[in-house]
Amino acid sequence: MRIDILTLFPDTMRAMLGESILGRAQARGLLDIRCHQIRDYTENRQKQVDDYPYGGGWGQVMMAQPLKSCLDAALADSTVPVERRRVIYLSPQGPTFTQAKARQLKADYDQLVLVCGHYEGVDERFIEACVDEELSIGDFVLTGGELGAMVVTDCVCRMVPGVLSDTECYTGESHWAGRLEYPQYTRPETWEGRTVPEVLRGGNHAEIEAWRTRQSLERTLKRPDLFQETPPTPDEQRLLDKIRRDRSRPQLTEPPICRAATEDDLPAILAIAQQARNYLRRHRVDQWQGVYP
């Protein structure tokens, strides 16, 4: 998988994307991540990449020429077929990036070109001429597209075979199948009075799997929109019904207390005995349940 990032801050991007899992994957040749300085492709001595917007208004707009020249340079040595390349502009106006979208990008393309805007955005003519699609990482506005580009890069690249040790490293995580992941614990067994659930320490894999399934569904109940996107299976629905029933039952704030009787309890015990005697005589029955005051 090749990722080309067009940005005004390539050194920052390289530093972040060259660490940890993605850094090791690049060293092993599994990923090819390249960061291109847009400012290197300007046609003026000042290295200016932006100008005032037509029609007035606040801020500056990135010019189409340096963006197009930078894009051309990024694609010049690409051996990836055109149909397997995708140019994406990170923008708050695009559809929201999701795990499903990441899977689609990973499956359909071998090269992604991520364009990072800045200031008030980029000249619309560049988007019309060169961009295949816009993507947003949420309904908020950032200073530039760099954070969005890092999010897309990390999410897509971790699904490249060999980047993670096993496919289960990401197929069992939140959002992969429209569900949120169950809680995770590690050593020590007890920390600040909080203990790892007993089921996870028992070694019964069937019970552990059942616990994790229930915990995953309980967490996903916090995001009902996920059930709309991926409706529950019949088995999940039965478990969800049980979870809701369990939640609707009143919970005892304190457990019942039992203790041995003392001399102080003798008057109450005698009173119960008298109640029993009177009840048996009056109703002519041989069983009675007294109420301890």
Regions found by a protein language model. Give the residues of each.
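SAM-dependent methyltransferases
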Residues: 1, 188-255
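Extreme N-terminal starter segment of soluble prokaryotic enzymes
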Residues: 1-4, 85, 256-257
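N-terminal nucleotide/polyanion-binding subdomain common to many enzyme families
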Residues: 1-77, 207-221, 225-228
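S-adenosyl-L-methionine/SAH cofactor-binding core of RNA-modifying enzymes
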Residues: 63-118, 161
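Structured adenosyl-cofactor binding patch, chiefly the S-adenosyl-L-methionine
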Residues: 122, 126-173
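Internal, active-site/partner-interface "lid" segment
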Residues: 147, 159-199
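A short beta-loop-alpha structural element at the N-terminal edge
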Residues: 257-271
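Conserved GNAT-fold acetyl-CoA-binding loop/helix
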Residues: 270, 274-293
